[in-house]
Amino acid sequence: MIGIIGAMEEEVTILKNKLTQLSEISVAHVKFYTGILKDREVVITQSGIGKVNAAISTTLLINKFKPDIIINTGSAGALDESLNVGDVLISDDVKYHDADATAFGYEYGQVPQMPVAFQSSKPLIEKVSQVVQQQQLTAKVGLIVSGDSFIGSVEQRQKIKKAFPNAMAVEMEATAIAQTCYQFNVPFVVVRAVSDLANGEAEMSFEAFLEKAAVSSSQTVEALVSQL
């Protein structure tokens, strides 16, 4: 069983509509869609936006469906200036950009008693990298950071880049999903696409290009599923 998590309806609808033998179940107000995608059993959920929603949905998915792996799909804001709208983002590490327990000796972004970063499954990273090469898509593997704010100003962007110079993208759920997978020992990877450049024009760009990002990330996830 492959688990696929997206925060927003636009981020999961394309994949959900491709499921055969579709079945829907609701647990604690979270909807799960099971079915067959590319001859593989999958379960898709729309988690809702933000870290708490993401962690709850991931926990429910793992407990109810016992997935072998989890893929987080959707959109993100680019922090790497070489990235453009529609480019595919593949996580190697994910971190929180809004966690601060440095007063107790932890690194900025590290939750107490948790790793500094949550590492994606290397075999899954390799698989996704092969997929994007086959599809001739522009993609980047790197650090994705998460927090409970939509990054829509130059000041916010600069603050994150100062704390995490190597971060390529920012969004609101991936690290919470990764932490949950870490605690349940479920391999994961984040496969998202750029919807905006996390700057003063981010809100307008996000609204205009969310669909493009959703198509790009969904196509990549579908191709990945076919090779798992």
UniProtKB/Swiss-Prot annotation:
CDD domains: MTAN. GO terms for molecular function: adenosylhomocysteine nucleosidase activity; methylthioadenosine nucleosidase activity. It holds the Pfam family PNP_UDP_1. It comes from the Bacteria. GO terms for cellular component: cytosol. The keyword Hydrolase applies. Pathway: Amino-acid biosynthesis; L-methionine biosynthesis via salvage pathway; S-methyl-5-thio-alpha-D-ribose 1-phosphate from S-methyl-5'-thioadenosine (hydrolase route): step 1/2. The active site is at residues 11, 196. Keywords: Amino-acid biosynthesis, Hydrolase, Methionine biosynthesis. Catalyzes the irreversible cleavage of the glycosidic bond in both 5'-methylthioadenosine (MTA) and S-adenosylhomocysteine (SAH/AdoHcy) to adenine and the corresponding thioribose, 5'-methylthioribose and S-ribosylhomocysteine, respectively. Also cleaves 5'-deoxyadenosine, a toxic by-product of radical S-adenosylmethionine (SAM) enzymes, into 5-deoxyribose and adenine. PANTHER family: 5'-METHYLTHIOADENOSINE/S-ADENOSYLHOMOCYSTEINE NUCLEOSIDASE, 5'-METHYLTHIOADENOSINE_S-ADENOSYLHOMOCYSTEINE NUCLEOSIDASE. Belongs to the PNP/UDP phosphorylase family. MtnN subfamily. This is 5'-methylthioadenosine/S-adenosylhomocysteine nucleosidase. It comes from Staphylococcus aureus (strain MRSA252).
